[in-house]
């Protein structure tokens, strides 16, 4: 029973942190004092569940990684057409971002500016993993469909992911007014026409 309460409290702390990142407070540095107040516990109680604020952010990063990478793997298992795979992966990231604005502050690096460098490295590693997946999808086109792209797969993957990162940054910069999926179909039509 105590383990379940501890697990629930950990989740409650992470949810409160994500909510704070989504609010106007997320535009500035979040302190453990503010977070403890939001959760309704003492600052010491936070540290019973997490040894540091960096570990709290790591908990959210782990959630982001698991959510995105597991869904990307599902896309790769279920879809075989290269362009459709790419479209679904890009759309997945944008939809995830739109549904989780507070977590988008982490993905964009905005929430991590004044935090431990290790956290920024984790986000960079996540984007490198996604870019590697995109490169692999692009390379497999030659094997699956007998077609290649007019541009090197490495350059193309970086460009595709860069477009997504730009949408995430715009979403954060606008205080979540410009939805990442807004005009996605037109955006995809433009991109896919260039890489067919």
From Swiss-Prot:
Pfam families, A to Z: SlmA-like_C, TetR_N
Domain HTH tetR-type: 7-68
SUPFAM superfamilies given in the database record: Homeodomain-like, Tetracyclin repressor-like, C-terminal domain
Coiled coil: 65-142
Annotated GO CC locations: bacterial nucleoid; cytoplasm
Cell compartments where the protein resides: Cytoplasm, Nucleoid
Gene Ontology BP terms: cell division; negative regulation of division septum assembly
Domain of life: Bacteria
Keywords: Cell cycle, Cell division, Coiled coil, Cytoplasm, DNA-binding
GO MF: DNA-binding transcription factor activity; transcription cis-regulatory region binding
Record feature DNA-binding region, as residue ranges: 31-50
Family per similarity comment: Belongs to the nucleoid occlusion factor SlmA family.
Functional summary from the UniProt entry: Required for nucleoid occlusion (NO) phenomenon, which prevents Z-ring formation and cell division over the nucleoid. Acts as a DNA-associated cell division inhibitor that binds simultaneously chromosomal DNA and FtsZ, and disrupts the assembly of FtsZ polymers. SlmA-DNA-binding sequences (SBS) are dispersed on non-Ter regions of the chromosome, preventing FtsZ polymerization at these regions.
Subunit comment: Homodimer. Interacts with FtsZ.
Protein's recorded name: Nucleoid occlusion factor SlmA
The organism of origin for this protein: Vibrio atlanticus (strain LGP32) (Vibrio splendidus (strain Mel32))
């Amino acid at each position: 029973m105590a383990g379940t309460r501890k697990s629930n409290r950990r989740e409650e702390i992470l949810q409160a942190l994500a909510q704070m990142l989504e609010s106007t407070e997320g535009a500035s540095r979040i302190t453990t004092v503010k977070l403890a107040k939001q959760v309704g516990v003492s600052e010491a109680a936070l540290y019973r569940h997490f040894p540091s604020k960096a570990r709290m952010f790591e908990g959210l990063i782990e959630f982001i990684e698991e959510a995105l990478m597991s869904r990307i793997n599902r896309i790769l298992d279920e879809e075989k057409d290269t362009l459709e795979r790419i479209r679904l992966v890009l759309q997945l990231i944008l939809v995830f971002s739109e549904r989780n604005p507070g977590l988008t502050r982490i993905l964009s690096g905005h929430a991590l500016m004044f935090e431990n460098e290790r956290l920024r490295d984790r986000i960079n590693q996540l984007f490198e993993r996604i870019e590697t997946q995109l490169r692999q999808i692009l390379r497999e086109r030659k094997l699956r469909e007998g077609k290649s792209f007019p541009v090197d797969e490495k350059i193309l993957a970086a460009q595709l992911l860069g477009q997504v990162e730009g949408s995430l940054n715009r979403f954060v910069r606008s205080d979540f007014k410009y939805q990442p999926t807004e005009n996605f179909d037109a955006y995809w039509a433009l991109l896919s026409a260039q890489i067919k």
